[in-house]
Amino acid sequence: RAIKDCRTLALGGHVDACDSCGHIQISYNSCRNRHCPKCQGHKRQQWIEARETELLPVPYFHVVFTLPDDLNGLALHKPKIIYDALFRAAWETVEAFTGKHNKAGMISILHTWGQNLSLHPHIHCIIPGGFVDRNGIWKLSKTDGKFLFPVKAMSKVYRAKYVALLRTSDMEIEQSTFDTLFKKEW
């Protein structure tokens, strides 16, 4: 709740007044929550700048892997299993598209909420637009420049890999849940 109320009247505030000209400005208090984009925007920018120094001089692609809301209950009750499977399925999908003997790379970060602060598990991945082949040579991916891999094909592979990981987990999941997951586009 504090994040929603950040820099609003709900958290109080103070009045700044200029002794010289009489200008008055109301400033509302921040929530100081480490997850708040208003309070932590400068830290986010610092993180981005630090990551930019680590980048190779190659094209990069932003790829997002999302879980359908049918899995929200499981994400709340078994987060380690659900999120481990999310990262693993994403990585296995990238590996599947770069080829068996090639080495890809990826930086990924978990977000568990959406823009409206509701539960929406997904990971943002920054993936180099290429790979190192079996001889240690860098190869650019064959892409149209807009997408690293075909989106629909990648979605289907990701869904299959994620569901396979759920099936092998120690969670008891009804078959109807798996049926529902395969009926949806991911």
What do these predicted ranges mean?
Residues R1-W186:
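Beta->alpha loop/short-helix hinge microenvironment recognizer with preference
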